[in-house]
Amino acid sequence: MRFILVLVLILGLVSSSFGINVDKNEVSQTELQSARDFSSFAIGFAEGIEISLTGNLHKCVAAAESSFSEFSNSFHLIDSGLKHKSLGDAKSGLRDFGIGLVDLVKTYQRCGVGKFISEISAISKEVTNETGIIKLIIHEVIDIFHNSHSLTSDFKSAISDCGRGDYTGCGVASGKIVGILMRQ
């Protein structure tokens, strides 16, 4: 612990001697944008999973102050896993997706959204552990062969929307993914 503290102090001294200055407004703008992105995502997710957000619920979810970073990171890793056929990246991405779902559930609970909360929580727990991820991957392979509908195409849609900055669309696609998993 002392080593880390000394390292942080040295880093601070070195950065101040070189005139490196972190603009606190820039950091807060980034956090604010991430919260806005999360809010748009949460509203889109509700639409994708077919939860009706009326009046005050919509306003409450729109005012969420959670960060979109877990979902953003998850889509980046899943995209990398799909492009490079990297099981490790895909698994890490699914794990981050599950962690993001935990934040989403907390937002919905805080706003009084009761529909599907337990199901979304169960899915978030499932994709944050190794066994659940393996089951999801096996199920995905079977689903592609039997139904010609794959979660992969929904994930690609979410990734594409996220890349374009369409966080509502990204949320809709993610809501559809979770909706499909809930029906399994």
From Swiss-Prot:
Cellular location of this protein? Secreted
Per the annotation, the residue ranges of the short sequence motif Cell attachment site are 164-166
- GO cellular component terms attached to this protein's record: extracellular region
Q: Which UniProt keywords apply?
A: Glycoprotein, Secreted, Signal
Broad class of where this protein is predominantly found? secreted
Glycosylation is annotated at: 129
The UniProt record lists the keyword Signal: yes
Q: Which residues form the signal peptide?
A: 1-19
What family does the entry list?
A: Belongs to the Sct family.
Q: What is this protein called?
A: Secreted protein B
Query: Which species is the source of this protein?
Result: Dictyostelium discoideum
